[in-house]
A protein has these predicted regions:
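Accessory cap/linker subdomain of secreted extracellular hydrolases
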Residues: 7-11, 73-220
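Short glycine-enriched nucleophile-adjacent loop
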Residues: 45-56, 62
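Active-site nucleophile loop of the alpha/beta-hydrolase fold
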Residues: 63-72
Length: 223
């Protein structure tokens, strides 16, 4: 069963807002708009794609950037990354310091996989970095990871898995993307990351039927 808020998020709100916006513009300017254009990215990109399919006469031109056309798959990938990098109580297992260490180690290993040393990884798919190589003996204070931290990084690289360890998504984070995890997946100072907050609200009020509401927590999620 779909609720009105889910239908609105899925397609209705963009169309109704467009119709209302055109009416407001016509009332204010005394003439209907001659042309209407839409541009959006991510969810906005999906909105543009849906508009083109469901309401093709709403706009004369649509630019859809990075459209999220697989809401379920995208949500699972983001949830997996956030959960992997936090403990059951929601505390981050790594911070920006450790992720900078990991990123530097990845660049050091894989920068030359395209034959050019430029601080960039030419083909992240060819980078087989293992974060467990950064695990140091207990008490070492160099740029080291704990076993649990290395497991967390490896889990994000591997992508969502079921209870038997089988991949359930083609999407995952490549080695070299670690700096993008900062604030998006984990955040310093005990604050929730961007996607921790985003995924919490989506799974509470959008992704299930019926919605579990405020009792749902990322730490209790089972992928």
């Amino acid at each position: 069963m779909l609720f009105r808020s889910e239908v609105d998020f899925g397609f209705r709100a963009t169309h109704v807002t467009t119709v209302a916006g055109k009416a407001i513009a016509a009332a204010f300017y005394g003439a209907a708009p001659r042309r209407a254009y839409f541009t959006g990215c991510s969810t906005g990109g999906r909105q543009g794609m849906v508009e083109a399919q469901r309401f093709p006469y709403d706009f004369d031109g649509i630019v859809s950037g990075a459209p999220v056309v697989d809401e379920t798959g995208d949500a699972v990938v983001l949830l997996w990354a956030v959960k992997s990098l936090h403990d059951a109580n929601g505390s981050a297992l790594l911070g920006s310091r450790e992720l900078n260490w990991v990123h530097a180690a990845v660049i050091a290993q894989c920068d030359m996989n395209d034959g050019v040393r430029d601080g960039l990884i030419g083909d992240p798919r060819a980078c087989t970095f293992d974060p467990h190589a950064m695990v140091c003996p207990r008490g070492a204070d160099a740029q080291c990871l704990t076993e649990r931290q290395a497991n967390a990084v490896a889990a994000v690289y591997a992508g969502p898995r079921d209870s038997k360890g089988r991949s359930i998504s083609v999407a995952h984070a490549f080695p070299g993307s670690e700096l993008n995890w900062i604030n998006n997946y984990v955040r310093d100072g005990g604050l929730p990351s961007i996607y921790a907050g985003f995924m919490t609200e989506m799974f509470r009020y959008l992704n299930f039927s019926p919605d579990p509401g405020p009792s749902w927590q990322i730490g209790r999620a089972h992928v």
